[in-house]
Design a protein with these regions (language model features):
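Perimembrane helix-loop-helix junctions
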Residues: 5-6, 181, 186-188, 194, ...
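Signature aromatic-anchored transmembrane alpha helix within multi-pass, membrane-resident enzymes
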Residues: 38-41, 246, 327, 366, ...
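Short acidic/glycine- and proline-prone juxtamembrane loop motifs at membrane-interface regions
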Residues: 59, 157-170, 353
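Membrane-interface transmembrane helices that cradle and orient dolichyl/undecaprenyl
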Residues: 137-143, 178-198, 208, 322-324, ...
């Protein structure tokens, strides 16, 4: 028996639907897990391919991660403009570098490279859905697993992450694969070499941590809790898993020690940890001057309301699953309890950034499917109500997901295409947020000039602005510059999308700009940002967040 050929785990006490025809269909579907997993993965990839370029605006972190993969493809340490990069471990950068090398992708333009690598993260997202299906099927049965996978196919927050070059998607793939091996061991019924299986499970979980440190909460903490919670995982087994976990990161640390970078890594990790726990609030919703979390939730409710429901249900579903008699279900429940608790802590005290919601949603969906099966095991009379509620939630998720992937949100891509043919060769353009600075840095016409004084000093008569980040305090420009441009500038290009609001290229008269510079419109020049890599501030830096 292979890892994927796992027996169907029926929901005890739940009557099947009447009629031999439907029962036969159910049996045939349940007996072909590989085919069903592959079908769900193909559907996932197809849905993500719809809006991969046009429905998800460019983020600066994507360009950093793409460039880090490019540096590895050249045989270098992961590095940005200011030196080797240590804020995040190199797991995904190794994968990205291998793909760049294998497919001979061009790395000269970071923006183009991002859109190439989005196909990689979409493929990994499809793999994660297949793994989630197999995981839930192992402990809860085929139909709860199909429901969980279908929710993951369309869930807006999952789509948002799978469709961008973010670290969370590959990390989740490793976690789900490791949990699948662990659950297979806990549920029994398989012959073979259990020590090797446990070690491989730990190795996969360790690869998740090697991709993003914060995934230690998803990969390591549930294993530790499983030892003490109703003896879900025997200590001897946990020891083997933990041994496998430490191998990837230990190899990374040895490499840093040999190359002399261990001290720089420790500094970057210490800074990232202080940000994570809230001791230093420089990013996220709890940072000074950041928009209110409540306001942001209300603004995004049209797109992500089901995501918020799943975030709230995550720890509750985890508690239900963790109370099961079956150890595999308890382990899945513990992952949701840990991730839901982490999300609550970050929202209240730590550095909460939107992409942190992705692993919480994934853990919540898998636990919710398992919790539903657990409830039906104990209360079969609730079957009809469970089917109705789960169907309504799935329908709402699908509606929002389809709306998201069919919506236009590609202002920078459209501006880049427009500028290639319409912008004069001798134009001087001030760009006013970090993403545009990074995307356009190789074009001599553009520069990080976001005040009237900077624009005048550099002979710029064009200004590229993004309204929503500027109004929220996330751009290099201040809202007063945007107000001044509304009154004194001439818009030459305008695009509207949910991420940036209005992306506008303005033309300004030299005399009006000189008068504005004399009055100090836009305030003093913004300080450079710390890239969180080698500690040197660089103007185009962006990833100064948490590990």
């Amino acid at each position: 028996m292979t890892l994927l050929d796992q027996p169907h785990a029926p929901v005890a006490g739940t009557p099947g639907p009447p009629g031999p025809g439907r029962a036969g269909v159910r049996r045939r579907v349940a007996s072909t897990p590989l085919l069903l997993a592959a079908t769900l993965a193909a559907l996932t990839f197809a849905v993500r391919s719809i809006g991969l370029a046009r429905s998800f605006e460019l983020w600066i972190d994507e360009m950093h991660y793409a460039d880090l993969g490019a540096s590895i493809s050249r045989g270098e340490m992961p590095a940005l403009a200011d030196g080797p990069f240590f804020l995040h471990p190199p797991g995904f950068f190794l994968v990205g570098g291998a793909v760049i090398r294998l497919l001979d992708l061009q790395t000269g333009d970071s923006m183009d490279l991002v859109y190439d690598l989005r196909w990689l993260t979409s493929a990994l997202g499809a793999l994660s859905v297949a793994l989630a299906f197999l995981l839930v099927r192992r402990v809860a049965g085929t139909w709860p697993a199909v429901w969980a996978a279908a929710v993951l196919v369309f869930e807006p927050f999952v789509l948002r992450n799978n469709s961008r070059v973010f670290l969370e998607t590959p990390a989740a793939v490793a976690v789900l694969a490791g949990l699948l091996l662990l659950v297979r061991h806990l549920e029994g019924g398989d012959r073979g070499r259990p020590r090797l299986r446990l070690f491989l499970a730990g190795l996969l979980l360790g690869l998740a941590v090697l991709t993003k440190d914060v995934f230690a909460f998803y990969a390591v903490a549930p294993v530790l809790l499983a030892v003490v919670w109703r003896r879900t995982l025997p200590f001897r087994d946990a020891r083997t898993v933990l041994l496998g976990m430490v191998v990837p990161y230990a190899a990374y640390l040895v490499l840093l020690w040999v190359t002399g970078y261990l001290g720089a890594w420790a500094t970057a990790k210490a800074d990232g940890f202080l940000r994570l726990v809230g001791a230093e609030q420089t990013t996220g919703f709890n940072a000074p001057g950041a928009p209110s979390l409540v306001e942001r939730l209300l603004d995004q409710a049209l797109h992500y309301s089901t995501s918020y429901v799943l975030l709230l249900l995550c720890p509750l579903a985890g508690l239900v699953a963790a109370a099961s008699r079956r150890p595999g279900r308890r382990l899945v429940g513990l992952t949701a309890v840990v991730m839901g608790s982490l999300g609550a802590f970050l929202a209240l005290f730590g550095t909460l950034e939107e992409h942190f919601g992705y692993p919480v949603v994934v853990a919540g969906i898998t636990a919710l499917a398992v919790a539903g099966a657990e409830v039906l095991d104990r209360r079969p009379s609730l079957r009809k109500a469970t089917v109705v509620v789960s169907s309504v939630l799935l329908a709402a998720v699908a509606f929002l997901g389809v709306s998201l992937v069919t919506e236009d949100d590609d202002g920078f891509l459209r501006f880049s295409a427009w500028a290639a043919t319409e912008l004069p060769a001798d134009a001087r353009v001030g760009v006013t947020n970090d993403t545009s600075v990074r995307a356009l840095r190789d074009d001599d016409r553009f520069g990080p000039w976001s005040t009237a004084e900077q624009l005048q000093e550099n002979g710029a008569q064009y200004v590229l602005t993004v309204s929503l980040p500027t109004e929220q305090g996330y751009a290099r420009a201040r809202p007063e510059l945007l107000d001044w441009l509304e009154d004194n500038g001439t818009p030459l290009f305008r695009d509207e999308g949910p991420t940036n609001g209005e992306t506008v290229l303005w033309f300004v008269d030299r005399d009006a700009l000189a008068a504005a510079a004399a009055r100090g419109v836009g305030g003093p020049p913004p300080p450079p940002l710390d890239a969180g890599t080698a500690g040197e501030p660089v103007p185009e830096a962006g990833d100064g967040g948490t590990p």
